[in-house]
């Protein structure tokens, strides 16, 4: 279970979820009809090696991401999610935004793989071990950012707004924010603090996009925890539910709407249909998670 002030690197706790997601993006890129192509996700997997690389080579048939149920749908999910947020950033820069803030940046490679207008600055916030890993892997392969990229080594439970300002963020200029795959790892109070921080630093003309997930019913979450603990103890599964804060928060679209933003939430399953990917059936392992997931974007008029 999580504890206040807990820490991690790229292969442990919350950090390892970034590798898991990068592996899914790499598998999506191998499809003949990918929704999004992240050419650098594979580099991260191979840098760590082991099962992270084996699954890309087809040498890990029992890996979760290779399963017909969870694996197939999770890879589709990552392709769709990446496509959604890539399109969000294109709209933001077309509207004139030249400051981008990536919260809990993890192995996000958009600074390296998307086209950015001249004068764009991307601020990436995460724990120092995670930022170091990404920079060293990509730098070791000669990959350079396509615009100015500034690393801010900070825990989002600390005073990240001040750290962002100290790194040159201009609160008087429009900005585009992203919280992708982050909120489920925050307690409710920290999510409120995060949204408040974004709102306080974002001037008129700014944009924000988040992945929002409603909590599971308490009894269902407790059952998932018990099942997962047994599987982890047997060596057959990585922790996931043990990393979550299953706490009730205001839906992101509601929160930002109530604070003067124009927000639109798109249920994940609706977006999957829109981009031509199957929605998990009622008996699927991921059905409950997908049904509670919403992709939201908002502008501050």
Curated annotation (Swiss-Prot):
Q: What is its EC number?
A: 2.1.1.-
Q: Which UniProt keywords apply?
A: Methyltransferase, S-adenosyl-L-methionine, Transferase
List, alphabetically, the Gene3D superfamilies matched. Answer: Vaccinia Virus protein VP39
User: Which residues participate in S-adenosyl-L-methionine binding?
Assistant: 126, 155-156
Know the name of this protein? Answer: Putative S-adenosyl-L-methionine-dependent methyltransferase MMAR_0539
Tell me if Zinc is a UniProt keyword of this record.
no
Q: Which family does it belong to?
A: Belongs to the UPF0677 family.
By its UniProt entry, which InterPro entries does this protein fall under? Ppm1/Ppm2/Tcmp (IPR007213), SAM-dependent_MTases_sf (IPR029063), SAM_mthyl_Trfase_ML2640-like (IPR011610)
Cited function: Exhibits S-adenosyl-L-methionine-dependent methyltransferase activity.
Report any Pfam family annotated for this entry.
LCM
Has the keyword S-adenosyl-L-methionine been applied to this entry?
A: yes
Q: Which GO terms describe its molecular function?
A: methyltransferase activity
Q: Which GO terms describe its biological process?
A: methylation
Indicate the enzyme's highest-level EC class: transferase
The superkingdom listed in its UniProt entry is Bacteria
| PANTHER family cross-referenced by the UniProt entry | S-ADENOSYL-L-METHIONINE-DEPENDENT METHYLTRANSFERASE YKTD-RELATED, S-ADENOSYL-L-METHIONINE-DEPENDENT METHYLTRANSFERASES SUPERFAMILY PROTEIN
């Amino acid at each position: 279970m999580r504890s206040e002030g807990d820490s991690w690197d790229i292969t442990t706790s919350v950090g390892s979820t970034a590798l898991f997601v990068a592996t899914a993006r790499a598998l999506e890129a191998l499809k003949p009809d990918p929704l999004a192509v992240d050419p650098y996700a594979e580099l991260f997997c191979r840098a760590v090696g082991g099962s992270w690389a084996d699954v890309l080579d087809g040498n890990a048939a029992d890996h979760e991401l290779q399963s017909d149920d969870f694996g197939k749908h999770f890879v589709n999910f990552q392709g769709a999610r990446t496509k959604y947020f890539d399109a969000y950033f294109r709209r933001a820069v077309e509207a004139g935004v030249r400051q981008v803030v990536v919260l809990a940046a993890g192995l996000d490679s958009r600074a390296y793989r998307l086209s950015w207008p001249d004068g764009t600055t991307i601020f990436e916030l995460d724990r120092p071990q995670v930022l170091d890993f990404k920079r060293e892997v990509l730098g070791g392969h000669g990959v350079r950012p396509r615009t100015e990229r500034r690393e801010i080594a900070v825990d989002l439970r600390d005073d990240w707004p001040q750290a962002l300002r100290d790194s040159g963020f201009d609160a008087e200029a429009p900005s585009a924010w992203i919280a992708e795959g982050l909120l489920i790892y925050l307690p409710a109070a920290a999510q409120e603090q995060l949204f408040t921080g974004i709102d306080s630093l974002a001037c008129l003309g700014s944009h924000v996009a988040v992945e929002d997930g409603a909590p599971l019913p308490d009894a269902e979450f407790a059952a998932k925890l018990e099942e997962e603990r047994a599987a982890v103890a047997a060596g057959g599964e990585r922790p996931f539910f043990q990393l979550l804060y299953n706490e009730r928060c205001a839906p992101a679209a509601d929160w930002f709407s109530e604070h003067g933003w124009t927000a639109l939430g798109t249920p994940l399953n609706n977006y999957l249909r829109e981009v031509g990917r199957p929605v998990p059936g009622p008996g699927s392992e991921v059905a409950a998670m997908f049904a509670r997931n919403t992709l939201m974007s908002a502008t501050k008029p």
